[in-house]
Amino acid sequence: MTTTLRIGGLEKFSTVDWPGRLVATVFCQGCGWRCRYCHNPHLLSFRVGAPLEGEWTWPALVAWLRDRRGLLEGVVFSGGEPTLQAGLTAAMREARDLGFRVGLHTGGPVPALLAAALPLVDWVGFDLKAPFEHYFRITGRPGGEAARSSLQLLRESGVEHEVRTTWHPDLLGEQDLMDMAGELEQAGSRRWVLQVFRPDGCADEGLRARSPGDVPEVLLAREGLEVVWR
């Protein structure tokens, strides 16, 4: 049976989507959240039907990957939100069968779907959006409790991972950051990557119009949690 994965794009060679590894990044189509800072708005809709002209199919991508064995170290499934695709775990198995390590970018909107993917994954980039009780402010949808449960699943799985958050002062204030740091410490996380907002691809004119400026000093030194700004 042919694996079905709706693919919105492919980064053939990336060194940033899985720190320290040369990977191909598969951008899965569709996301249930509407984050204001999203720089891939074209990936939000859940398109159905035949692939568009020039759009990758999973079988074609498998054939391409087969010829890159020994060159690429891994395949990262990003999005959109890849865990919402029914064909994700089958695609991960096929990538592993080709000899590639498998990475995943996710916000954890459905913990059960993340749990199904974790046994097939070598590394996860987990997108923490906001303090759990304020997720709607960033995503436009409820989701804080789902994210909390997904983070707990990820921690308990033992899978190597990175928790990261996109920061813009119009979205997250200093108290928000302090609250998030406390939640991460409570969850047992020891490292948190804060990514300064970049306007490329973002559809929100208000965010693009204001430069983030200097990073808040409130988190530059914190006992028990390493905070890394990018």
Predicted regions and their residues:
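Short, charged low-complexity linear segments at domain edges
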Residues: T2-R21, V196
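Canonical Radical SAM [4Fe-4S] cluster-binding loop centered on the CxxxCxxC motif
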Residues: G9, W18-E55
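Class I S-adenosyl-L-methionine
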Residues: E11, A24-F27, Q195, E226-W229
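Residues that line or immediately flank small-molecule/substrate-binding pockets and catalytic motifs
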Residues: S14, H42, G79, L128, ...
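A secondary-structure boundary/capping signal
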Residues: F27, S78-G79
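Conserved alpha-helical substructure of the radical SAM core
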Residues: P41-V75
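Conserved AdoMet/S-adenosylmethionine-binding subsite of the radical SAM
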Residues: V62-G74, T83-A209
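Short acidic, glycine/proline-enriched helix-loop-strand junctions
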Residues: V163, G201-R230
